[in-house]
UniProtKB/Swiss-Prot annotation:
GO biological process terms, semicolon-separated: L-threonine catabolic process to propionate; threonine metabolic process
Pfam families documented for this protein: Ribonuc_L-PSP
Family, as annotated: Belongs to the RutC family.
Modified residues (N6-(pyridoxal phosphate)lysine): 58
Gene of this entry: tdcF
Organism listed in the record: Escherichia coli (strain K12)
UniProt keyword Hydrolase present: yes
Binding-site positions, substrate: 105-107, 120
EC number: 3.5.4.-
Gene3D superfamilies associated with the record: RutC-like (3.30.1330.40)
Function: May be a post-translational regulator that controls the metabolic fate of L-threonine or the potentially toxic intermediate 2-ketobutyrate.
Name assigned to this protein: Putative reactive intermediate deaminase TdcF
Subunit structure, interactors included: Homotrimer.
Pathway noted in the entry: Amino-acid degradation; L-threonine degradation via propanoate pathway
Amino acid sequence: MKKIIETQRAPGAIGPYVQGVDLGSMVFTSGQIPVCPQTGEIPADVQDQARLSLENVKAIVVAAGLSVGDIIKMTVFITDLNDFATINEVYKQFFDEHQATYPTRSCVQVARLPKDVKLEIEAIAVRSA
């Protein structure tokens, strides 16, 4: 059975979609841009944007009763491949801090993202039986 995930710890949807969907064994997040859920502010720096997007993904996964370690796949959309190394540093630090194995990942450059942010991240997490 499908359950919609909603949390105040991640920014609300800016279109006709939900933050996440829990299918029981799997959780899918919508793409998370670096919007602070409390203030609506967007950091200017790509490092801060990457960290905030990861924290927003984490908030949705946690709202579903899972943890960072349950994430098995991430897709990262970036507007400038020159930011790839910087984003990788933040990404590595985030997963290391949570003592989680790195999930599979795709990273693609796109022309533009909502609110002209530098990146967007979505995830798939799996609930162990």
